[in-house]
Amino acid sequence: MKYDTSELCDIYQEDINVVEPLFSNFGGRSSFGGQITTVKCFEDNGLLYDLLEENGKDRILLVDGGGSVRKALVDAELAQLAVLNEWEGIVVYGAVRQVDALSELDLGIQAMAAIPAGCPSEGIGDSDIRVNFGGVTFFSGDYLYADNTGIILSEEPLGLDDDDLDDDLLEE
């Protein structure tokens, strides 16, 4: 499903938070949306592997990497695991690598930057906790919608089948 965050902002302005424009799209999907699972980890992606092995249907992994762009938290192997388990997307407050491979995957990926350096996979970090970046506080269970224009957050799923929506807003 495709989302237009500008249109969603116009319709649901009282019900959403808009994340500051810190992110670029690195995945093969230009837009994505779903319920978030939060992770906080700094320059270590071991916990991401554990979480992305779960069923990701209608889910987005939201990663607070402390804004570090010194080491990439997401690479092609990790993103491929997300695709295999049907995740909608990954948002990284940090960096990714292997961007050419990421752009070929049927997965939404937004991050701050790309860098070739990888990180260890020791499993250090926490999941399902409150995280804050980009002027927004995220909780596991919130709903996130992203496209090339930006990222928005809602406590509840947006009524995407409402008659209010433009016909081009959603495409299968």
UniProtKB/Swiss-Prot annotation:
The superkingdom of the source organism is Bacteria
Q: Name one GO molecular function term.
A: enzyme binding
According to the UniProt record, one GO cellular component term is:
cytosol
Q: Which Gene3D superfamilies match?
A: Ribonuclease E inhibitor RraA/RraA-like
**Pfam families in UniProt:** RraA-like
Q: Name which cysteines form disulfide bonds.
A: none
Which residue stretches, if any, does this entry annotate as coiled coil? Answer: none
Task: Give an example GO biological process.
Answer: negative regulation of RNA catabolic process
Subcellular location, principal? cytoplasm
Q: Does the keyword Cytoplasm apply?
A: yes
Its localization reads: Cytoplasm
Which keywords has UniProt assigned to this entry?
A: Cytoplasm
Q: How does it assemble?
A: Homotrimer. Binds to both RNA-binding sites in the C-terminal region of Rne and to RhlB.
What this protein is reported to do is described as: Globally modulates RNA abundance by binding to RNase E (Rne) and regulating its endonucleolytic activity. Can modulate Rne action in a substrate-dependent manner by altering the composition of the degradosome. Modulates RNA-binding and helicase activities of the degradosome.
Which PANTHER family does the entry mention?
A: 4-HYDROXY-4-METHYL-2-OXOGLUTARATE ALDOLASE 3-RELATED (PTHR33254), REGULATOR OF RIBONUCLEASE ACTIVITY A (PTHR33254:SF29)
Which NCBIfam families does the entry mention? NOT-MenG, PRK09372.1, RraA_entero
The record's family statement is:
Belongs to the RraA family.
Q: What is this protein called?
A: Regulator of ribonuclease activity A
Please give the organism.
Proteus mirabilis (strain HI4320)
Gene that encodes it: rraA
